[in-house]
Amino acid sequence: MFNINHQLELSKRRTFAIISHPDAGKTTVTEKMLLLGKVIRTSGTIKARGNGKYAKSDWMNIEKKRGISITTSVMQFTYKNTLMNLLDTPGHEDFSEDTYRILTAVDCCLLIIDAAKGIEDRTKKLINVSRLHNTPVITFINKLDRDSREAIEILDEIEKELSLDCIPITWPISCGKNFKGICHIHDKIVNLYQKNIVKKINFNSFSSFLNEHSLKEYLGADLYTQLHEELKLAAYVYPKFSKKKFLKGDITPVLFGSALNNFGIDHILESLIKWAPSPIYRVTKTRKVEPEEKKFTGFVFKIQANMDLKHRDRIAFMRIVSGKYKKGIKLRHVRMKKDIIVSDAFSFLAGDRFSIEHAYPGDVIGIHNHGTIKIGDTFTEGEEIKFVGIPSFAPEVFRRIFLKNPLQQKKLKKGLSQLSEEGAIQVFRPMINNSLILGAIGILQFDVVIERLKIEYKIDAIYERVNISLARWIRSKNKKIISDFINKNKSYLALDISNQLIYLAPNKANLAVIKNIYNNIFFEKTREQ
């Protein structure tokens, strides 16, 4: 185990992801956190505008053009002597696989909910994934300055739809045009709301230990009475916060505010400092690895191609689990059974990166990837272990890709290989011909790949529909059975980027029949990286 200094570094780190249904305000919350962390001076306008300003966390050209988040941004900043490692996940559901992998690298989630819309479809899916790892969740009800539903109605919906017990920490004073602020339920501090100039941070607090008379005068008799009744009801209905239950993922503390107007963001950050865990252990195939351990371990959860278009580089994002990164450290690339010297790791602020001398558990560092690193790879100071829990998901939509210029075939294979490595798309090579089949979770992924091939690799390509509706990875310990299966079903089989065998079914009926015939073969929807 390490010394007191190492324990201090662990204690001041929080690694968390922001998750939400699209348009709930996730990217806005991210921007306002960066403002409070004093790493940017103004926030972007989130959607493409004529003045050329965009969200800092949306750094890819296509994100700026479309006004959506399609890739994970990693950002590190300090707030009140706490080092925050923030992972802003893709907002669009077509890029959910990237989000799932990111949740394996964090210790806490911040869930953003639109106060008018409440729980939406993607919200449920994200919470189910966080539950796989028992990741604790803090909830922020956003957009209180717009017309919204009653607070207690939203809390009831969270408990019913997400099976999470809510513990309101703050309580809204009305909403929409009448939104007056929030009250901290237990210490009775009131934060009065004033609409700030958009994109400008107001560091002056409106907190007031208001006495009964002045608060009643400010709110008016009716609203004052309503607030008192709601606070009494909340105190009666909802139990007090328990950090133990929170860390187990059984309850979620709930905060209210308006991210666009910088109201309530400081409460989120303070809650993360107070309740979110410092870096926790991770599981390998053989044992747990604790963050206090002396020797370095880490795993790659994301690869990004062409962060720097001038150099065509590929960056591997690594979550440090234990030990300490030091410039020039010798690391074991476990899957490749090779040792490497890492002298140029860096930290991130969305698309920007900065060289670092050292890093600790909970930190996300970037290292250069020359084509040998894959998502899920483990790095150690010599121990032969493998971190688990980073999945690939079977794609749900498929296309065949063609070149407008056949002479670019070599460039196309290279581009698709790199985009596949980072998880932007899945590439399959049929066993019976030389075509290339792309698989994705959603249609938008295909549009993004075509655009990235054009911008980053100077390749013009088009798609055609293909008679495939389902894909399943094939697994069996019996080599004879697999060999027989391949010989009889080659027209439905392909290899993925890792040379894993996959069955491409034209419809559900076909898959059901083949599974019934080969009931001693596993047809799997997910595959461990």
UniProtKB/Swiss-Prot annotation:
GO terms classed as biological process: regulation of translational termination
GO cellular component: cytosol
Residues bound to GTP: 20-27, 88-92, 142-145
Domain tr-type G: start-end pairs: 11-280
Localisation: Cytoplasm
An example Gene Ontology molecular-function term: guanosine tetraphosphate binding
InterPro entries: EF-G-like_DII, EFG_III/V, G_TR_CS, P-loop_NTPase, PrfC, RF3_C, RF3_dom_3_sf, RF3_GTP-bd
Classification via Pfam families: EF-G_D2, GTP_EFTU, RF3_C
Principal subcellular localisation of the protein: cytoplasm
Keyword Lipid metabolism among record annotations: no
Keywords on record: Cytoplasm, GTP-binding, Nucleotide-binding, Protein biosynthesis
The UniProt record lists the keyword Ribosomal protein: no
Protein's job: Increases the formation of ribosomal termination complexes and stimulates activities of RF-1 and RF-2. It binds guanine nucleotides and has strong preference for UGA stop codons. It may interact directly with the ribosome. The stimulation of RF-1 and RF-2 is significantly reduced by GTP and GDP, but not by GMP.
Sequence similarity: Belongs to the TRAFAC class translation factor GTPase superfamily. Classic translation factor GTPase family. PrfC subfamily.
Name of the molecule in the record: Peptide chain release factor 3
